[in-house]
């Protein structure tokens, strides 16, 4: 039977960090706290651990919400690594995620990943799929077999807006995604990694799973170059079992994505199919 991931109650961590997704801000890299955080942890946080298995048929298994899925992995709610549900399953796994999609390079990134059988989650900002062009891009990503996640409507810092506005940021994007592809997102990634008590309640009501990350660098000026980005993503101390890699819909990430994915494989990591990661919504629909 499928196993659902419950959202843990957790303590608040305040950290004034810089925007990972806003290119006008300067940024520095920090390690994600390994505490049970549902609050402020910016997109410049870094840290890792892991678990999972690669499935060459990830395109088929991730496309249908109603399709029965045998979950073998879960998101660690404290440190956001990907961990096996059973001891015998592969622990040396890594998850690829792309935030701020679909901006200008999402389709190119997706096509490159698909060409090397590398699954990923594309985290969607609702503001990008209000237009017909944005909706068509989202459909293409979904039709290529990629998991679609919710990254809020306007990339607002949830800790700086009202509970009503937080609900709008999450629910509106869920509705836009569902209207476009007929599937509700299973994973939510808060802008800047800043979760709140209110967002936790909404995510629970929506049967979703919080998914921050363990490390990422592509918003920092020093790594806005394909070679530099590839090097740090493959050689950082935070690359460990269950690594949850944060990247963005950016030109340098587009240029580096194949080398990053292939480099992870060369280091012995299995690129996990997000369809194998547990969520309460998908488990209920499969029963």
Where are these regions (language model features)?
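N-terminal secretory signal peptides that target proteins for export/translocation
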Residues: 1-2
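N-terminal pre-catalytic segment of deacetylase/amide-hydrolase enzymes
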Residues: 6-11, 21-96, 102-111, 115, ...
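C-terminal motif of bacterial Sec signal peptides marking the signal peptidase cleavage site
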Residues: 16-20
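Metal-dependent polysaccharide deacetylase catalytic core of the NodB/CE4 family, i.e.
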Residues: 92-94, 114-229, 233, 239-245
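Short, glycine/acidic-enriched loop or turn micro-motifs at the edges of active sites
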Residues: 102-103, 154, 251
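Short, well-ordered alpha-helical microsegments
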Residues: 105-107, 195-199, 253-255
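Histidine/acidic-residue-rich catalytic or RNA/ligand-binding cores of hydrolases
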Residues: 224, 257-258, 285-286
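Catalytic grooves of carbohydrate-active enzymes
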Residues: 238-252, 256-275
